[in-house]
């Protein structure tokens, strides 16, 4: 289930985002979380399986597009379709907008989708 990030989930969210290649530095990670907390165009969502939060996906709304800035799944929960479930939940949430990965999320995005979906475009 996709849930909206809350401050009480900060450490869990930071842990999940730290799996992103550009989020290894603690100061950068703290700034990323702060950006999601303060920028109204950015939203961070977490994926909950049973009682565990096992995934994170962060977006930035840009007119008719929603850019996927971050996407990460806990390594012990990978290869279970969680990335695809997060994408499907976002597509449902942002029905009138196009989901677009950025350079850092494109590879993961494509793997989660399995193939290019006509509702989704890709940045090159």
UniProtKB/Swiss-Prot annotation:
A single GO molecular function term of this UniProt record: acyltransferase activity, transferring groups other than amino-acyl groups
Residue stretches making up the N-acetyltransferase domain: 3-124
Keyword Transferase found: yes
E.C. number(s) listed in UniProt: 2.3.1.-
Keywords tagged on the record: Acyltransferase, Riboflavin biosynthesis, Transferase
CDD domains listed in its UniProt record: NAT_SF
Top-rank taxon, per record: Bacteria
Biological processes per GO annotation: riboflavin biosynthetic process
Enzyme class per UniProt: transferase
Reported function: Involved in riboflavin biosynthesis.
Protein name according to UniProt: Protein RibT
Organism of this sequence: Bacillus subtilis (strain 168)
